[in-house]
Amino acid sequence: MKNLNRILLSIKFMNKYFTYLIAIISGLLGVFAFSPFDYWPLAYVSLLGLLYVAKNPKKSTALLSTFLWAMGFFCFGVSWLNVSIHQFGGASLGVSYFLVGLLAAYLALYPMLFTYLVHHFKVQSAVIFAVIWTLTEFLRGWIFTGFPWLQFGYTQIDSPFYGIAPIFGVTGLTFFTVWASAVIFNLVSSLFKTKNLKLVLANALLLIIVGGLSAYSSRIHFVKSVEDKAISVTLAQGNIEQNLKWDPNYFYSTLAIYQKLITENLGKTDLIILPESALPTLENAITPFFEGLERAAKETKTEIMVGTVFQDTKSGKLLNSIMTAGNPDFPYQPNTQNRYNKHHLVPFGEYVPLESILRPLNSVFNLPMSAFQSGEAVQPSLIAKKRAFSPAICYEIIFGEQVRQNLKQDTDYLLTLSNDAWFGDSIGPWQHLQMARMRALELGKPLIRATNTGISVFVDAQGKVLAQAPQFIETTLTYKIAPAEGKTPYSVLGNMPLYALSLLFLLLHSMMAFIRRKMNIL
């Protein structure tokens, strides 16, 4: 009997640690569904692993396993932060890994909340799994200004189901991915219960029908390209190393690089675009340079956009900005209306919360240019070559609702300027590009992305890359890109239809549960 008890305890012990192993492996696998790997089916594999551990009968095991899943997922998924914290923030490698782990542990709270709610409400329905996940992802993208990085919907941009995005956005695509994974999970679980043959068949049929309809939705085009309004755009990629970018001794070298890239293309293209904070000094300090740029642009009829660091002379705010030169309707001047100022700033990168307390603690809280202030949440379009551009600077492009709110009736293009040199040769810039592509697909507008070290691209209104410059070289990329006319359902309604459907699913599920309880009592 003692031997039998030992065997049973050993099996129980092994089962628990097998669950932990499944959690870590499936969490890590989830990252391979995102760019640059793009193995999109692994999103479903990762979520199946999460559902397996979340449904563990013992709540404490389920919660710990979910934490391990999330640590594997987020530690690997945001590992690119090590580059900026260690190499450019001056933190030791140990401190850098600790801070990334701390962020991952915080982000793990949201999947753990998912598991807690699944256990608390004894969830079995696939659609309710998706509703709860949508709630926790909403919270992750909102609390403390939000960090909606690594949403599973992004992995599906190159899958057969990408057509969901123009209707329900990346949130809807995430909902579908979780729902489909939950249906598969319930399907596999039902196979081991002979009494549930009808449930097996119902789940299989439902998955086939909805999966087929979702794949078919990719054939629906809500917008069309207007080729006769195409303009030639040149992206100037200076490839300035981040450790040199803010070095005062390298300023004139940076200026010379961009002067050369601009001069080579003046008169040969309609519009030249430089990346985020292209020139590492206050725009106000080199006003004569921009006045010269204005004259050259007007003479050659090539308009220019530049990412700058600008101090508003009225408010005194330090702003991450985009200015234009050569526009006959908006001549260059520091306080021109034809300017965009970044609204959604990067915590600790562009501003430091609790600044007076944190800055003295460690050099990691003293990154270059970490004292910006926010521009308005909704701003006018930038105008160049009689075309309207809806801008987002760097990190802002991951906030789909903010980008949607800045879309105007006359918007021709989405524009994003970035400096991904902060993240070196890591997976970060590729994930960032994938999210930018999703904005184009959701809103049905072509996207232009100008960066310092790459990845500079032109993207069509279906989220497909039209032209791409290599990373880490000084170069220009020119493409004749046409605007798109029409509206996607998501561009008009945003996330409200999905949230309304989620609420409806919850109400129906609650009503059915109530009816079942009443019938059992009777």
Swiss-Prot record:
One of its GO terms (cellular component) is plasma membrane. It is a multi-pass membrane protein. This is Apolipoprotein N-acyltransferase. Catalyzes the phospholipid dependent N-acylation of the N-terminal cysteine of apolipoprotein, the last step in lipoprotein maturation. The active site is at residues 276, 342, 394. It holds the Pfam family LNT_N. It comes from the Bacteria. Keywords: Acyltransferase, Cell inner membrane, Cell membrane, Membrane, Transferase, Transmembrane, Transmembrane helix. Its main location: membrane. Pathway: Protein modification; lipoprotein biosynthesis (N-acyl transfer). Residues 236-483 form the CN hydrolase domain. Belongs to the CN hydrolase family. Apolipoprotein N-acyltransferase subfamily. The keyword Metal-binding does not apply. Its EC number is 2.3.1.269. The keyword Ligase does not apply. The chain crosses the membrane at residues 17-37, 61-81, 98-118, 127-147, 164-184, 197-217, 495-515. It comes from Haemophilus influenzae (strain ATCC 51907 / DSM 11121 / KW20 / Rd). One of its GO terms (molecular function) is N-acyltransferase activity. GO terms for biological process: lipoprotein biosynthetic process. It is found in: Cell inner membrane. PROSITE patterns: CN_HYDROLASE (PS50263).
